[in-house]
């Protein structure tokens, strides 16, 4: 990618060495405004953006609020709180099937979100006090949401980053802030690329392009044979190649 673009990689507030402001309301829009200001102060009047998980939410709102500056966005996850709101009678069979599987996934896998969006401080104290508890809490997600077995060094580095910075609690506040200070979804006209990774569709359902087109101006849709929720870390070369192809095509 560096052969074709300048690459700016900001860290979300509250993760790793990036502190989170000591106030409520640090939602997608709050962060996206800081990203836009960052790019403006670096001298970029037009730029592309990419993200997954909370980064996908920030990227979506960035494109929604600054369509003249953001030439395109690349996503690998759909944030559930920004999902299209559609009457059931308007859904296709594929969309209905996806939502049914996804609701089942919610029942078995989304317990973490329930507690992190209501009592993040409570669970945070326990995880910050126990390296084993922190490793189990984070490591279980890699086991459940990925089809790639990360190296011990990678996992230990991830756990250590959370542990040494004591940032697991501040990272979980993303769930609280975006639940209680939500940003209303709206159609994003900015050209959008979406990467669908095989393992994510196994548990969360086969995400139909038509469903995403209710919210985004989808211009590129790539299905990958490997990878899951943590795609940029699991399959970095594939994600970088898809990013490069998409943004080069936008001129």
Residue ranges, per PLM feature:
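Conserved hydrolase catalytic core segment
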Residues: 2-4, 44-95
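The feature captures the conserved acid-bearing segment of alpha/beta-hydrolase catalytic domains
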Residues: 88-120, 184-187, 213
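Alpha/beta-hydrolase active-site loop
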Residues: 25-41
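Conserved HGGG/HGGXW glycine-rich cap/lid loop of the alpha/beta-hydrolase fold
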Residues: 1-17, 247
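Glycine-rich "HGGG/HGxG" loop immediately N-terminal to the catalytic nucleophile
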Residues: 12-26, 60
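Alpha/beta-hydrolase active-site loop signature
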Residues: 13-16, 80, 228
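C-terminal subdomain of alpha/beta-hydrolase-fold enzymes, centered on the catalytic histidine
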Residues: 116-251
């Amino acid at each position: 990618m560096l052969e074709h673009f300048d690459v700016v990689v900001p860290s979300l507030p509250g993760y790793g060495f990036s502190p989170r402001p000591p106030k409520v309301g640090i939602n997608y829009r709050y962060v996206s405004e800081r990203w836009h200001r960052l790019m403006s102060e670096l001298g970029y009047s037009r730029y592309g953006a990419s993200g997954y998980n909370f980064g996908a939410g920030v990227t979506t709102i960035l494109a929604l609020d600054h369509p003249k500056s953001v030439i395109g966005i690349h996503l690998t996850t759909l944030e559930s709180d920004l999902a299209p709101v559609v009457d059931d009678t308007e859904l296709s069979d594929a969309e209905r099937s996806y939502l049914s599987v996804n609701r089942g996934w919610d029942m078995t896998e989304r317990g973490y979100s329930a507690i992190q969006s209501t009592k993040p401080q409570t669970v945070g104290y326990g995880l910050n006090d126990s390296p084993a508890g922190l490793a189990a809490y984070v490591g279980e997600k890699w086991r459940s949401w990925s089809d790639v077995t990360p190296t011990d060094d990678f996992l230990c580095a991830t756990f250590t980053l959370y542990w040494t910075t004591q940032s697991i609690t501040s990272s979980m506040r993303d769930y609280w802030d975006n639940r209680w200070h939500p940003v209303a979804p709206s159609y994003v006209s900015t050209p959008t690329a979406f990467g669908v990774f095989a393992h994510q569709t196994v548990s969360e359902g086969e995400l139909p392009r038509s469903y995403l087109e209710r919210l985004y101006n989808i211009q590129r849709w790539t299905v990958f044979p490997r990878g899951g929720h943590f795609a940029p870390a699991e399959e970095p070369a594939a994600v970088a190649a898809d990013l490069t192809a998409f943004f080069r095509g936008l001129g």
